[in-house]
């Protein structure tokens, strides 16, 4: 996947596989959809995937609020075996969760303390994100469906590494 933490994970997997006697070659292959298609097509052998991404994006399944991490993992593991003939390995301790970040000054100025506040006061905000987040069910569309609103003055799409610079420039 094409962002910093994935570059780190990819290189870590390459090192661990090499040290375990495998001849591993890490090659970034794009975003979630590109990596998924590449593994289904046999173009790559392994890549780190998030169970939430697998559930919502690749399998097109709905998240149910009663599903904990173990249920999501089991659902993804079973469906990947059945639908794609792919083995989902045991989860690592690595975790990635989306959060919304804004400066304290801007939050104070607009009276924003919760995600619900952002949903109703977004008209004054410029939202920096990736193209993928604007399209994913667990991204901006999911926020809009869950909270309503989330209509920003502007949505600026940028690479992951550029968002901190964007936030600091405001």
Place the predicted regions along the sequence by residue.
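Extracytoplasmic "Venus flytrap"
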Residues: 1-11, 30-32, 132-135
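Ligand-binding pocket segment of bilobal, Venus flytrap-like solute-binding proteins
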Residues: 44-45, 123-170
């Amino acid at each position: 996947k094409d962002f910093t933490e994935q570059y780190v994970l990819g290189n870590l997997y390459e090192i661990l596989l090499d040290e375990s006697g495998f001849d591993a070659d890490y090659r970034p292959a794009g975003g979630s959809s590109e990596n998924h298609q590449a593994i289904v097509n046999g173009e790559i052998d392994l890549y780190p995937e998030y169970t939430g991404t697998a559930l919502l994006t690749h399998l097109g399944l709905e998240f149910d609020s009663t599903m904990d991490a173990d249920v999501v993992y089991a659902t993804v593991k079973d469906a990947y075996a059945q639908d794609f003939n792919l083995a989902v390995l045991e989860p690592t301790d690595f975790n990635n969760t989306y959060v919304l970040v804004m400066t304290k000054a801007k939050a104070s100025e607009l009276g924003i303390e919760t995600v619900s506040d952002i949903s109703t006061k977004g008209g004054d905000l410029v939202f920096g994100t990736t193209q993928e987040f604007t399209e994913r069910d667990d991204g901006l569309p999911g926020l809009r469906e869950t909270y309503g609103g989330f209509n920003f003055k502007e949505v600026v799409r940028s690479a992951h590494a550029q968002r901190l610079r964007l936030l600091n420039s405001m």
